[in-house]
């Protein structure tokens, strides 16, 4: 069961960030706090309590009102004390189960989906995006926190800064308030309470304490924003390696819609170039295919995904592919029989995408997730575009005819297999 409330600790003075609230630092086009709240909302958390200091309270209040979040500010008048004290200040605002996280931690969507359904301290045994030397280590015994701290020489996992607790934790903070005069860390609370540990390994999360770490967080968000399920061989091994690096440079400057337009125009230019230079047209076509993944990467990294955006992008891709093959046929083919072959190639190219998109429309599910066999079939758009470029690099009539014949057979064979696998899947009453 997902907790309905979350406490976000944001009382630190952020001295290493130029005295700017770390929760309001923008990473990949969005404030860190916006990311945390938005992703928690998507997973069922409804109410948020932000514990901050007097200086930053007006800034956080304006942020909350601007975005319409159901959140409440609690002021910590003594932010120089440990963050355990900040947690204690929220005790009157939560009851039962609640999530706890830090305002300077950046999490990916898949991390939040797993973590919010965990229990106790969420730990990572395979951290990919943090500096191990600076991270808080955890020793685990009997599935509970045994020891915790940055200087542990022997440890089992890294503290991710995300917790799923209940109000029993405030009995421990009350004891530490009296023992430590309010100056104690969250780590002390977890070690004293011996909270449970849930492992969420190898997913995207990191903390942002310095300007340099913003770059690491940005890279993490872009790299974990790759869709993956519908990618073909060329995308996995070539296109994404390039597009993610470009996305890292653009994610703070360009919107997904702007990138969609740029990619579409480049695709149309590549089609027109078939009338001038086939090798150049092929190269531009492949370049447009590489860049075609950027709008989706930006949308997911910036939390700007929309059904409309995906719909428009899919339509424009069909126009690019249709224009390219039609103009290529016009520029290179003279015999009627090869016009027919080119027509089959064009129809097959359109139907490859239509067959999977129509599945989504009919069953409201991703065809590649529901029918995993489709992932292994050759003929996805990235593979067809790359193949087209290779054929066009050799300017002889036979290579163009071979291209159209290959595309005609490959695409229509793939559509036939897609139809077969879908019918087989749907015919089983428990599959859809």
Swiss-Prot record:
Required cofactor(s) = Mg(2+)
A GO MF term: phosphotransferase activity, for other substituted phosphate groups
What is the membrane topology listed in the Swiss-Prot or TrEMBL record?
Multi-pass membrane protein
InterPro entries, A to Z: CDP-OH_P_trans, CDP-OH_PTrfase_TM_dom, CDP_ALCOHOL_P_TRANSF_CS, IPC_transferase/DIPP_synth, MobA-like_NTP_Trfase, Nucleotide-diphossugar_trans
Q: One GO cellular component from the entry? A: membrane
Transmembrane segments annotated in the record for this chain? 264-284, 337-356, 385-405
Q: Is Magnesium among this UniProt entry's keywords?
A: yes
- Keywords per UniProt: Magnesium, Membrane, Metal-binding, Multifunctional enzyme, Transferase, Transmembrane, Transmembrane helix
Which positions are annotated as binding Mg(2+)?
Answer: 113
Entry's Gene Ontology BP terms:
phospholipid biosynthetic process
| Region feature CDP-alcohol phosphatidyltransferases, mapped onto this chain | 226-426
**Annotated PROSITE patterns:** CDP_ALCOHOL_P_TRANSF (PS00379)
User: What's the Enzyme Commission number for this chain?
Assistant: 2.7.7.74, 2.7.8.34
Its subcellular locations are: Membrane
Spell out the reaction equation it catalyses.
1D-myo-inositol 3-phosphate + CTP + H(+) = CDP-1L-myo-inositol + diphosphate; CDP-1L-myo-inositol + 1D-myo-inositol 3-phosphate = bis(1L-myo-inositol) 3,1'-phosphate 1-phosphate + CMP + H(+)
One Pfam short name: CDP-OH_P_transf
Keyword Magnesium found: yes
Main localization of the protein? membrane
Enzymatic class: transferase
Region of interest (MobA-like NTP transferase), residue spans: 3-225
Residues annotated to bind CTP: 9-11, 22, 113
The record's family statement is: In the N-terminal section; belongs to the MobA family.
| Role this protein plays | Involved in biosynthesis of di-myo-inositol phosphate (DIP), a widespread organic solute in microorganisms adapted to hot environments. Catalyzes the condensation of CTP and L-myo-inositol-1-phosphate into CDP-L-myo-inositol, as well as the biosynthesis of di-myo-inositol-1,3'-phosphate-1'-phosphate (DIPP) from CDP-L-myo-inositol and L-myo-inositol-1-phosphate.
This protein is called Bifunctional IPC transferase and DIPP synthase
| Protein's organism | Thermococcus kodakarensis (strain ATCC BAA-918 / JCM 12380 / KOD1) (Pyrococcus kodakaraensis (strain KOD1))
Taxonomic placement: Archaea, Methanobacteriati, Methanobacteriota, Thermococci, Thermococcales
């Amino acid at each position: 069961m997902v907790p309905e409330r979350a406490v976000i600790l944001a009382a630190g003075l952020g001295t290493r960030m130029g005295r700017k609230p770390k929760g309001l630092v923008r990473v990949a086009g969005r404030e860190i706090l916006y990311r945390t709240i938005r992703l928690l909302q998507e997973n069922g958390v409804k109410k948020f309590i932000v514990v901050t200091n007097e200086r930053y309270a007006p800034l956080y209040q304006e942020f909350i009102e601007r975005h319409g979040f159901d959140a409440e500010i609690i002021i910590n008048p003594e932010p120089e004390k440990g963050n355990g004290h900040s947690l204690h200040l929220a005790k009157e605002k939560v009851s039962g189960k609640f999530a706890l996280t830090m305002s300077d931690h950046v999490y990916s969507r898949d991390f939040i989906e797993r973590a919010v359904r965990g229990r106790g301290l969420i730990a990572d045994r395979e951290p990919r995006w943090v500096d191990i030397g600076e991270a808080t280590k955890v020793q685990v015994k009997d599935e509970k926190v045994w020891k915790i701290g940055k200087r542990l020489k022997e440890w089992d996992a890294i503290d991710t800064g995300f917790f799923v607790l209940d109000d029993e934790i405030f009995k421990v903070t009350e004891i530490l308030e009296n023992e430590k005069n309010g100056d104690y860390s969250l780590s002390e609370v977890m070690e004293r309470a011996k909270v449970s540990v849930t492992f969420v390994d190898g997913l995207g999360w990191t903390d942002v304490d310095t300007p340099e770490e913003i770059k690491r967080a940005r890279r993490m968000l872009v790299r974990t924003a790759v869709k993956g399920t519908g990618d073909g061989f060329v995308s996995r091994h070539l296109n994404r390696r390039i597009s993610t690096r470009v996305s890292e440079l653009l994610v703070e400057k360009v919107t997904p819609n702007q990138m969609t337009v740029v990619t579409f125009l480049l695709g149309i230019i590549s089609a027109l170039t078939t009338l001038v230079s086939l090798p150049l047209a092929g190269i531009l076509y492949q370049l447009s295919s590489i860049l075609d993944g950027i709008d989706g990467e930006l949308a997911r990294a910036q939390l700007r995904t929309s059904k409309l955006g995906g719909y428009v992008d899919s339509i424009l891709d069909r126009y690019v592919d249709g224009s390219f093959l039609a103009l290529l046929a016009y520029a290179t083919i003279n015999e009627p029989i090869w016009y027919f072959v080119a027509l089959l190639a064009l129809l097959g190219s359109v139907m490859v995408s239509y067959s999977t998109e129509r599945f989504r429309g009919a069953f409201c599910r991703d065809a590649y997730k529901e029918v995993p066999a489709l992932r292994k079939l050759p003929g996805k758009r990235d593979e067809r575009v790359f193949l087209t470029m290779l054929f066009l690099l050799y300017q002889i009539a036979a290579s163009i005819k071979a291209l159209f014949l290959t595309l005609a057979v490959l695409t229509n064979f793939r559509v036939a297999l897609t139809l077969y696998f879908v019918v087989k899947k749907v015919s089983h009453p428990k599959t859809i």
